């Protein structure tokens, strides 16, 4: 009858000898029909970066994504999951070529921010946030397209105290995204192309962000570019040198340009399914010369990574 149930656990050992869990989930459903999944995992990828790609700017999971002064590359990840301070419940359904998904993430909302700081204010967590993240996707042969949104539906979940001691809510976060993909690698493993075009927009408390990215994979080599724009309308500038000629009416405008690349070396030591992935990126944050918030010591970032993978 196609019914199934199961669980998945992905242990993760770090260099200090500690053992953690990357994903841990229980699921059940009906084959190619519907599924319910609960635990720690990632929902539908609305900003795919293609082959095993290394990009580290402010963060790369549901936690520590945002850091004041470093710029924010918004990728529809906030409600996707794999949080260290909460868990997911996801419902999904297939209807022919159409796929529906609703992911719910409940977590400590301040875990999104490094150092629990947002726009120069220390955040006070009042209650857990609950992100709702519906996705609708359509796939036909090599082409697919998906649209989604993610929104925290809990008001006054976290915020800060102003100079009069009043609580100021900062937990408004509404994101929207669309991604299109072409993937004919299954039909043509040697010369197939995997290409992605993605956009995302975030309307948050005192801030709006826009991101667009494109990447292409061909013959084991991947190359991509990401553009991000941040418009921060509110920022606590206490302690920041003031300029009477600039009233800080737009205290944080950033443009971020990122180029990333990846290359796969297959069958290491002639062992089938044992591959090496080499990844690198460079990212440049641009801000106006009179910007008081941009972190000048971190306006350029770059990194490289070598990852070995064995597929069982």
Predicted regions and their residues:
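Detector for outer-membrane/organellar transmembrane beta-barrel domains
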Residues: 133-264
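Residues that define the transmembrane beta-barrel architecture of outer-membrane proteins
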Residues: 18-24, 83-87, 94-96, 128-132, ...
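Transmembrane beta-strands of outer-membrane beta-barrel proteins
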Residues: 6-10, 39-41, 101-105, 146-150, ...
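Outer-membrane beta-barrel proteins
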Residues: 16, 47-50, 61-62, 100, ...
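Loop-centered beta-sheet repeat module
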Residues: 101-159
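Short loop/turn motifs that connect adjacent beta-strands in outer-membrane beta-barrel proteins
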Residues: 1-6, 29-36, 97, 138-142, ...
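Outer-membrane beta-barrel "beta-signal"
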Residues: 265, 299-312
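Outer membrane beta-barrel
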Residues: 1-107, 128, 137-141
